[in-house]
Amino acid sequence: MEKASGAQRERIGVVSGGASETAAKLVERAGKLNSERMVLTAPGDVRMAAAAAAVIAGESDPSVPVNGAVLAGFSGLSASYDDTPVDTRVTGGVTPLECVSGEVSIVRGITTRTTTGGAADKTWRELTTVRIVDDVIPALRASLRARFVRSTNTAQVRAAIRSQVMVELENKRAQEIIDSFGEVSVKASEDDPTVCLVEFSFAVAHGLNRIYLSAHITV
């Protein structure tokens, strides 16, 4: 997955947990994968992992979480989790599945990336985060590639590149794929005058996982 993504062919892989694996074993396996491009589902088998991959691939809006998405063709699971094991798995980088009324669905889409440099890191935990990045960056690449073929690396062209990047980011913001974006910087490389460097930042839109109600009742 990482090799393909490094070659600008962004991919996400889905693997299944063993039918009898404990929460500790699943979290340990997720920790060994520790990749924002790998998803570990449990309970279930490779068929359910494939169904989860189909759900992920079939969702056209990268900001929409797969939470609650039904895995077609399945009516039961080999095990069920209560809230505590579910939270343990989510925190540990495991995507839990559940069966309700004869339908198997994804509880919450999580990647196996839980640490960076050995320290706990939630940055890439949500599956929507990497999906949004995989939507925004290729879209910008394609837009710039289409509009600036055979261009010169002049101040005027760099200004046009900056404007185009801002247009694309504003489109993503309007689509609610990103929440916001920061300053866009475009400059010629000091090492190679034929190279244009574009830098920008953006905040991804977050999925809604839970709603907590606090009722203040007056009688």
Describe the residue ranges of each PLM region:
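A glycine- and small-residue-enriched flexible loop/hinge signal that marks low-structured segments
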Residues: 1-150, 161
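A generic structural signal for short, solvent-exposed coil/turn residues
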Residues: 4-6, 176-178, 190-192
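Glycine-rich loops and low-complexity Gly/Arg-rich segments
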Residues: 8-11, 165, 208-211
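Generic structural hydrophobic/aromatic packing signal, biased to beta-strands
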Residues: 14, 136, 184-186, 198-200
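Anaerobic metallocofactor- and corrinoid-dependent redox/one-carbon enzyme cores
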Residues: 74, 181, 198
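Extended, compositionally biased non-globular segments
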Residues: 137-185
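C-terminal edge-of-domain segments
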Residues: 188-219
